[in-house]
Structure formats: C-alpha cells, structure tokens
A protein has these predicted regions:
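Conserved donor-binding loop and adjoining core beta-sheet/short helix segment
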Residues: 1, 20, 28-83, 186-201, ...
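Helix N-cap/beta->alpha junction signal
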Residues: 5, 91-92, 134, 239
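Conserved acetyl-CoA-binding loop-helix of GNAT-fold acetyltransferases
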Residues: 70-76, 205, 211-225
Length: 275
C-alpha cells in the first residue's frame, strides 16, 4: 500500500463519502485533519477499478475501508504487522476476512445506529444541569471513562486525555458533563464531527449515580445537538442490551462493523503453545 498524499485526499474523500456509515471515523478524521495531524498516517491501494483499500492510523489504532472484497490482503497484512496497531476497526466483512489471518487479535462485532433527525425537537429533562466541558475537565473525564468495564479496556487515561484535548482544540469533538457533589457524575461526547454527521460516544455515568436519569438526559441532549445543527447522529453499539433499548428509541441499523483488539502478550504466547 502506498502512503496517501495531499493530492490523493480529495478523491479519497469522494470515495468514502459514497458509503459514510461504513467509514465514519475514517472520513471524519481525514476531512478535519487532512494529513497534517502528527498522530495520523494514511495509506491507499488501487486496482484496475480504481481506489480499493484505504487505511488510516490515528493514535496507533487503525481504521480500514474498501468497497470490494478483501480476499487479497497481502499488502495490508504486511502494513498491520509492521505497525502493530492495538485496534483495527472496519465494516464487518473486512474484519471477518482479516480475523483468521491475524491470530494475535480478538474479533468483536456490532452495529452502527443512525437516529432520526427530528427525534429530539423539544428540550429534554435535565438540560439545565448539562455543561460543555473544557480542557480542565479532561483528566477527570478520562478517568471516569477508563473506570468503565466496557469502555475502559479500549484506552489508557493518559492516551484518552490526549485524544479528548485534541478533539476539543480542533473542533473534532465536544464533551458534555453533569456535575454533582464537586465531581463529574456523567459524561457524553461527540467523538467525531464534520458537516454531515456527528458520532456520539463516551456516554458513562459514575457508579454512585447509576440510579439517576443522567444517562437519558445526556442521550437526549446529544440528539438535540445533532438536530439543531442539521447533522445525522451515529453511534456504535456492541452490547445486545443497549442495542435492543436503542432500537426502541427511533434508531435504525445503518451498517454492521467489527473491530480487532490485539491480545495481551501472555494470551498470544499461550495460543501459540497450542493450549
């Protein structure tokens, strides 16, 4: 695969724009940052039909896209083995094609949900309690997310804090919080934004406040934000319980996706030993 250049960028964005639900982060990062972000790198591969595979590395993890099959993966696998990303995300079919060839990774699958733009046309309960967070709040936000059993395994507090600050500074994302008793009790964020859409993520409530309605207040708040700004709202879900709840809440499955997470070194060695 060849390194993407500034000259490649317009046609790559046009290529991705045709299938946005299956390449949301890849498109948003390239649209906002171009190729100037020091924490990013991007590659592409072409064939007789034109652009085929696009790969992007952001803070170490990979996002992949291609609108054709991934049977020929030699150059991509070479890139993955060279860069050793801790995580790889792509549409489901791509992850299914790569997983058997990457035994040091564990596969997980989920769906991309899109919410109706008119869902949250009216103010929701608790809006007066919600504040947009600033960089001074980032360490506490990162600690709260990393303490969550599901979300926390994807990040380290320091690495997540760096990403959150970068999103705030560049306009790629915003965080919103509810404070109680001098601390952040709940948080939601837009983890990526561009003119067409936003991706909501990082919705977490401190264990001491799980009996509150904060989860629903923040979920409604970010839906209102998307509606006011005329953007589609997307979210990614792997938990079947959350999926059932969200499907009842006027969200449609827009795409299926998968992710590969690199196994800890001990797990990899045990598997190689034939256990």
């Amino acid at each position: 695969m060849k390194r993407m250049t500034r000259e490649d960028l317009p046609r790559v964005l046009d290529y991705l724009r045709k299938d946005l639900p299956r390449c949301l982060y890849l498109y948003a990062d390239l649209w906002v940052y171009g190729l100037d972000n020091p924490h990013m790198a991007a590659w592409l591969q072409e064939d007789g039909a034109g652009l085929g595979k696009v790969a992007m590395e952001y803070h170490g993890s990979f996002q992949l896209y291609g609108d054709r099959d991934f049977e020929e993966t030699g150059e991509l696998l070479e890139l993955i083995r060279r860069r050793q990303p801790p995580g790889i995300s792509a549409r489901r079919e791509i992850i299914e094609a790569l997983a058997p060839r990457l035994p040091d990774y564990t596969a997980e699958y989920g769906v991309v949900l899109r919410r109706d733009r008119d869902y949250a046309s009216q103010p929701g309960e608790g809006e007066a309690e919600i504040r947009q967070a600033g960089e001074e709040d980032v360490p506490e936000i990162a600690a709260l997310i990393c303490a969550d059993p599901e979300m926390g395994e994807q990040y380290t507090p320091g690495g997540l804090a760096e990403q959150l600050r970068e999103r705030m500074r560049t306009g790629m994302g915003r965080s919103f919080v509810i404070r109680r008793d001098g601390r952040i009790a709940a948080h939601v964020a837009t983890f990526a934004e561009c003119p067409e859409f936003l991706i909501s993520s990082g919705l977490v409530v401190h264990p001491d406040y799980r009996d509150s309605l904060y989860f629903y207040w923040l979920d409604h708040w970010v839906a209102r934000l998307a509606a006011r700004e005329g953007k589609d709202q997307y979210g990614m879900v792997t938990d079947p319980r959350l999926l059932r709840a969200f499907r009842r809440d006027r969200r449609q499955v827009a795409a299926e996706y998968g992710k590969l997470s690199r196994k800890p070194p001990e797990a990899g060695r045990e598997n190689q030993g034939g256990n």
